[in-house]
């Protein structure tokens, strides 16, 4: 995993989220500070940021890298590929609503082009210490079926419940929505032998539907890439983007073909 660290609230929240996930999974953590080319002062600043991050992560074994790039999102994507990280964690942009995700240029770039999964922390995020549940946003399409298989295995490995949530925005056949969700629950059982919880959130739009759902402290929301995503790239569609902006928990977006 790689955390994009900046000297602001979003950077600290990304760092806290990355550390929490590392403690749960036992994975390797790299903290990166991106600086523009031809800027010696910014390079020094990046090193200072990493030193600051190191103090905050005294109990978490981590690597620290200052990396030169013309854009933070691009730099994190290149660095993740170079060190074979399978997850990039970033924080919300300044000025967003507390408890919700606000995308800046870095997050927006990653959510449309990243070669690896991207996790975004809501504004004001503070870890609870325990991972309580994985929730996968589900619609009936191949990328989501692949994600059901992967997330059911992840839930089994991590020892946490898996919830499959879909949205009834009163524009589709509600019976078909529930039938599709039942098939996804069956897929989770066939893949990993776990009984996934099925949840249909109803509302006149995505934000309203998200408000009706129950969210636990320590929960993660996962979204599959859009059908428009290139192979092995993240691309967030319109519905998923609305979901991300309304989510009160950290959100992970998987690249197409995620393994």
Feature locations, PLM:
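Charged docking surfaces used in two-component/phosphorelay signaling
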Residues: 66-75, 201-208
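Active-site charged/polar residues at nucleotide-handling catalytic sites that mediate phosphoryl
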Residues: 83, 216
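Short, structured interface segments
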Residues: 105-126
């Amino acid at each position: 995993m790689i955390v994009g660290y900046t000297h602001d609230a979003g950077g600290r929240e990304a760092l806290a989220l990355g550390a929490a996930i590392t403690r749960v999974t036992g994975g390797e953590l790299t903290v990166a500070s991106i600086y523009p080319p031809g800027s010696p002062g910014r390079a020094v600043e990046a090193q200072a940021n990493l030193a600051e991050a190191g103090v905050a992560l005294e109990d978490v074994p981590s690597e620290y890298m200052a990396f030169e790039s013309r854009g933070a999102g691009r730099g994190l994507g290149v660095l993740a590929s170079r060190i074979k990280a399978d997850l990039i964690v970033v924080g919300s942009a300044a000025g967003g609503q507390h408890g919700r995700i606000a995308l800046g240029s870095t997050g927006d770039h990653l959510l449309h082009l990243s070669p690896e999964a991207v996790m975004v922390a809501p504004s004001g995020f503070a870890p609870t210490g325990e991972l309580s549940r994985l929730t996968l946003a589900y619609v009936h399409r191949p990328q989501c079926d692949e994600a059901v298989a992967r997330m059911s295995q992840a839930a089994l490995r991590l020892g946490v419940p898996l919830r499959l949530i879909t949205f009834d925005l009163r524009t589709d056949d509600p019976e078909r929505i529930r039938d599709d969700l039942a098939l996804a629950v069956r897929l989770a059982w066939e893949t990993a032998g776990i009984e996934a919880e099925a949840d249909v959130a109803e509302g006149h739009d995505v934000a309203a539907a998200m408000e009706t759902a129950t969210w636990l402290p320590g929960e993660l929301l996962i979204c599959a890439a859009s059908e428009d995503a290139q192979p092995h790239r993240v691309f967030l569609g319109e519905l998923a983007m609305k979901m991300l902006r309304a989510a009160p928990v950290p959100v992970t977006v998987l690249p197409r073909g995620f393994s």
